[in-house]
Amino acid sequence: MDRNQNPNRQPVELNRTSLYLGLLLIAVLGILFSSYFFN
């Protein structure tokens, strides 16, 4: 039971972190692209 609970809790945290990291990456990429276009 412990082994089943751990994997179930990990994906939720990974999904949330991945979503936040993805948003941050998109924001950084957007700023970089905007700077390149402006230059």
UniProtKB/Swiss-Prot annotation:
Keywords: Membrane, Photosynthesis, Photosystem II, Reaction center, Thylakoid, Transmembrane, Transmembrane helix
A family per Pfam: PsbL
Disulfide bond is among the record's keywords: no
SUPFAM superfamilies listed in its UniProt record: Photosystem II reaction center protein L, PsbL (SSF161017)
GO BP: any one term: photosynthesis
Transmembrane segments: 18-38
Record membrane topology: Single-pass membrane protein
Cellular location(s): Cellular thylakoid membrane
GO cellular component: photosystem II reaction center; plasma membrane-derived thylakoid membrane
Oligomer and partners: PSII is composed of 1 copy each of membrane proteins PsbA, PsbB, PsbC, PsbD, PsbE, PsbF, PsbH, PsbI, PsbJ, PsbK, PsbL, PsbM, PsbT, PsbX, PsbY, PsbZ, Psb30/Ycf12, peripheral proteins PsbO, CyanoQ (PsbQ), PsbU, PsbV and a large number of cofactors. It forms dimeric complexes.
Family from the record: Belongs to the PsbL family.
Name of the protein described by the UniProt record: Photosystem II reaction center protein L
Species of the source: Crocosphaera subtropica (strain ATCC 51142 / BH68)
